[in-house]
Regions:
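Binuclear metal-ion centers of metallo-dependent hydrolases, dominated by the metallo-beta-lactamase
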Residues: 1-8, 95-185
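Generic domain-boundary/flexible-linker signal
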Residues: 27, 88-89, 121, 156
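Metallo-beta-lactamase
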Residues: 40-97, 108, 113, 117-119
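Core dinuclear metal-dependent hydrolase active-site scaffold
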Residues: 2-71, 152-185
Length: 185
């Protein structure tokens, strides 16, 4: 099955809309000199769930076409790529464009990805995240940012104010009373 822009289907727990993705890299990878139409080579996914609407944009660049998406859909969470690009290798949004994308989509929570794990990111992940958080906080304080870690769990709306994910320390599984240092009555 191939996802096509405009498709809508159901999966357990969600209704999925296949939406436009404006990945300028993807439209250049067809092998010829002609640019491919966006809708033929890339797409975004909007998951409508009982907890809220999650938009996964995958790899994309900022594009004014997202204004229409933000007007047509209520987006609670936007997940997108972000990084710095080496000269001549633009592949990801900068922190500024990522913040602008969140504003354009009218998203409530922004979760960037790829900023910490790709060789062509060409930047210090902490610097990228600090800049992103500052740009969002100063320009669109109504939008929240959440910085996840690999294999971390995010539950919306409960976790929307965590800012930066922290791995559980396991203390919820400890029974101090069974320890030699625990309280003995």
């Amino acid at each position: 099955c191939v996802a096509r822009v405009g498709d809508v289907f159901e999966v357990p727990g969600a209704r999925v809309h296949i939406l436009m993705c404006y990945d300028q890299t993807a439209i250049r990878t067809g092998g010829g000199k002609e640019l491919l139409p966006f809708e033929e080579c890339c797409c975004s996914f909007l998951f409508e769930t009982s907890a809220g609407n999650i938009m996964f944009l995958g790899d994309t660049w900022y594009h004014d076409g997202y204004v229409k998406v933000g007007k047509e859909y209520d987006i609670d969470i936007a997940i997108f790529d972000m990084g710095f690009n080496a000269p001549g290798a633009t592949d990801k949004m900068t922190p500024y464009d990522a913040a602008r994308l969140g504003q354009t989509l009218r998203a409530k929570v922004l979760i960037p990805d790829h900023y910490d794990n790709w060789v062509n990111c060409a930047g210090d992940p902490d610097l990228i995240i600090n800049q992103f958080e500052r740009i969002v906080a100063e320009n669109t304080p109504e939008i929240k940012t959440v910085i996840m870690r690999c294999a971390g769990r995010f539950d919306f709306p409960k976790d929307q104010d965590i800012k930066r994910y922290r791995y559980p320390d396991g203390s919820e599984n400890y029974d101090v009373s069974k320890s030699v240092y625990g309280n003995k009555d």
